[in-house]
Amino acid sequence: MRLHELYPFAEERASRKRVGRGSGSGLGCTSGKGNKGQNARAGGGVRPGFEGGQMPLQRRLPKRGFKNAPFKATYEVINLDRLVASFEGKTDITLEDIYARGLCKAGASVKILGVGEVSVALTVEAHKFSASAAEKIRNAGGEAKALEG
């Protein structure tokens, strides 16, 4: 028997609470929700952070610092092994080729990562390269062209 095969005995496992099935069950009538009020209703309760109409904490505290999220540069990553498998027999790989093969969305910024091996001399165009990817491409006799933008 292994650690992930351990389980409690059937009589030790708590049975599921079945509410609203008669007063003899102990959870009939109001089904553990108390008497009346917003929380007793279907779909009742308040959203997280709601303080009953009082100005909530996240609005009472001042904003601090600079939020760069809208301007954050995001890249779609492609590993070398996937790139080599998709372009077998081709030595010049441009961004348009990558978009055309469906390796990433058209117009996306592309970063090449160094997972996998390169045996042929490739000329690869992308917005960014990891250090290991650029090194592997150069060691195979190829060229890693980093584009602007």
Curated annotation (Swiss-Prot):
Gene3D superfamilies: 3.100.10.10. GO terms for biological process: translation. One of its GO terms (cellular component) is cytosolic large ribosomal subunit. Residues 14-63 are annotated as: Disordered. Pfam families: Ribosomal_L27A. Keywords: Ribonucleoprotein, Ribosomal protein, RNA-binding, rRNA-binding. The keyword Ribonucleoprotein applies. Residues 21-35, 42-52 have a biased composition (Gly residues). One of its GO terms (molecular function) is rRNA binding. The keyword Transcription does not apply. Belongs to the universal ribosomal protein uL15 family. Binds to the 23S rRNA. Part of the 50S ribosomal subunit. This is Large ribosomal subunit protein uL15. It comes from Nitratidesulfovibrio vulgaris (strain DSM 19637 / Miyazaki F) (Desulfovibrio vulgaris). The lineage of its organism: Bacteria, Pseudomonadati, Thermodesulfobacteriota, Desulfovibrionia, Desulfovibrionales. The gene is rplO.
